[in-house]
A protein has these predicted regions:
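Short, intrinsically disordered terminal tails adjacent to the first/last structured region
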Residues: 1, 316, 437-454
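Alpha-helical transmembrane segments of multi-pass inner-membrane proteins
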Residues: 2-20, 30, 34-43, 68, ...
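N-terminal hydrophobic segments of proteins, predominantly signal-anchor/transmembrane helices
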Residues: 8-23, 43-124
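Short aromatic-rich membrane-water interface segments that cap or initiate transmembrane helices
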Residues: 89-119, 177-193, 304-307, 352-360
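Flexible juxtamembrane loops connecting transmembrane helices in multi-pass membrane enzymes
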Residues: 181-182, 250, 254, 282-320
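Peri-membrane helix termini and adjoining interfacial loops of integral membrane proteins
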Residues: 85-103, 165-177, 291, 337-345
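Helix-to-loop transition at the C-terminal end of transmembrane segments
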Residues: 24-28, 75-86, 158-169, 287-297, ...
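TM-adjacent membrane-interface loops and short helices in multi-pass inner/ER membrane proteins
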Residues: 74, 188, 309-350, 364-371
Length: 454
């Protein structure tokens, strides 16, 4: 019984994150998820079972430890002679001068309280990694949690579109949201689109599992019909959602996911499909780099800038101002407002760079850039291993597609800033590491090379 409970922790917690962690506006919901994350991590720490970590898990642990060290250094008090020499601190010194105060010891982060809040938001993804890798779980259960939450989100989205397009609607969970379109359990329609996209490879993985359970043609056809129905539901969700992110990434994600079911034998076919996915991803990034379309963002969501290029230019200016030292974790919105042109200021404000890589570079400086490159190298090597080795199953491959879609989307948005997508990303990474085929012997890991005569 205890083993079943332990294996249910990851899918149940993932489901909770997907339902409750759709926005930072949900203060109490996020606090509950963070406290639960601490409990999961503590459980894993006292679990007496001896489980050897796979090499990829050990590597990811090292990267995570480096990230934790970098975050901790943000809050270490520095003497005035040191922190005043860092780029971008002249504005802080001016503030001390206006108040007639002598500068004292201060941390590297310009907004340490925001940094602590951002660090606490990392607890759900860490707990998800620990739950899958240390406590263990069944891969299909995780996939079912993703697909189930997505189906519920689409149905909720249909009610949102059919109802009042304002905060007065009972179907929108957050006061500030993209009203008039399907946001599901999220405040941002782009983050709902991320969930819809990530659900596609997990639907395909479940379909591949169901089709291999039996040789009965009718049962296989029924399984494929269920898969087709689930994919149709996701397509409806994308239409109701109206996000450019969903439209731009749908084709490459769908093509890559199709390989989990069809599994073409020819290397040329597989390479062509992967090339199509790559081209689609590039087109997606190029599309979202164009000026914002008011039809998609809506007048209520308009920011004080008119295009992503202008936002990127302002973010680059922030990088130039704070240089290799960084401004501190969670400080982007405050830093941007310090440097924003008065002519562009109105009743709305920029809260994120809509490019998580650039935002982290501004906040964490050169060490953050190096850490991101190290993680991306790890992800690429792990994805390559999953694609080349027959030891990994369709859920590990679905994890590659899902995490890849999130990484691409993060170049033009900030989906990982929510507990929901953060936990989903962590679950995908964990599947890339531990989800393997069940085999009876080494011979099952490679194609049979001899003729069997019955």
């Amino acid at each position: 019984m205890s083993g079943r409970i332990r294996k249910a922790v990851a899918p149940v917690y993932l489901l909770l994150c997907l339902v409750l962690g759709g926005s930072a506006q949900g203060i109490w919901a996020n606090a509950f998820l963070q406290v639960t994350a601490i409990a999961i991590i503590a459980w894993a720490a006292v679990d007496g079972r001896e489980i050897g970590l796979p090499p990829r898990a050990r590597q990811l642990t090292i990267i995570g430890a480096l990230g934790l060290l970098l975050v901790a250094l943000q809050f270490v008090p520095l003497p005035p002679a040191l922190w005043t020499a860092l780029p971008g601190r002249s504005l802080v010194l001016e503030g001390f001068a206006i108040l007639g105060l002598e500068p004292g010891w201060m941390p590297l982060s310009l907004t340490p309280y925001d940094g602590l809040a951002t660090a606490a938001a990392l607890l759900p993804p860490v707990a998800m990694l620990v739950a899958v890798i240390k406590l263990g779980c069944r891969s299909p259960w995780l996939a079912l949690a993703v697909v189930g939450a997505t189906a519920a989100a689409v149905m909720l989205g249909a009610l949102q579109v059919a109802g009042v397009a304002s905060a007065e609607s009972p179907w929108y969970f957050y006061e500030r949201s993209n009203f008039g379109v399907a946001t599901g359990f999220f405040a941002n329609s782009n983050h709902m689109a991320t969930l819809l996209l990530v659900a596609i490879p997990f639907v395909a993985a479940l379909g591949a599992t169901a089709s291999r359970w039996t040789d009965d043609a009718r049962k296989r056809a029924a399984a494929m019909a269920i898969v087709a129905g689930a994919l149709l539901l996701i397509a409806v969700g994308l239409a109701l959602n109206g996000s450019l992110a969903g439209y731009g990434l749908a084709l490459p994600v769908a093509v890559a996911s199709l390989l989990l079911i069809v599994r073409p034998r020819g290397a040329v076919v597989r390479s062509a499909a992967l090339a199509l996915g790559f081209v689609g991803a590039v087109m997606f990034v190029q599309l979202l780099a164009s000026p914002l379309n008011e039809r998609f963002v809506g007048a209520g969501a308009a920011t004080s800038i008119s295009s992503r290029q202008a936002l990127t230019a302002g973010s680059v200016q922030a990088w130039e101002a704070f240089g290799p030292g960084g401004s501190g974790l969670g400080s982007y919105s405050e830093v941007y407002r310090l440097l924003e042109s008065p002519s562009q200021v109105n009743t709305t404000f920029v809260n994120h760079a809509h490019n998580d890589y650039l935002e982290l570079a501004i906040e964490l400086g050169l060490p953050g850039i190096l850490l991101m490159l190290l993680f991306l190298a790890w992800w690429g090597a792990t994805a390559w291993q999953v694609g080349r080795s027959q030891a990994f199953d369709q859920y590990a491959q679905a994890g590659v597609i899902a995490s890849g879609a999130i990484l691409v989307h993060s170049a033009v948005d900030f989906p990982l800033r929510t507990a929901a997508i953060g936990a989903l990303f962590a679950a995908s990474l964990a599947l890339m590491i531990v989800s393997k085929r069940r085999v009876d012997g080494k011979a099952d890991l490679r194609p049979t090379r001899h003729l069997v005569i019955h």
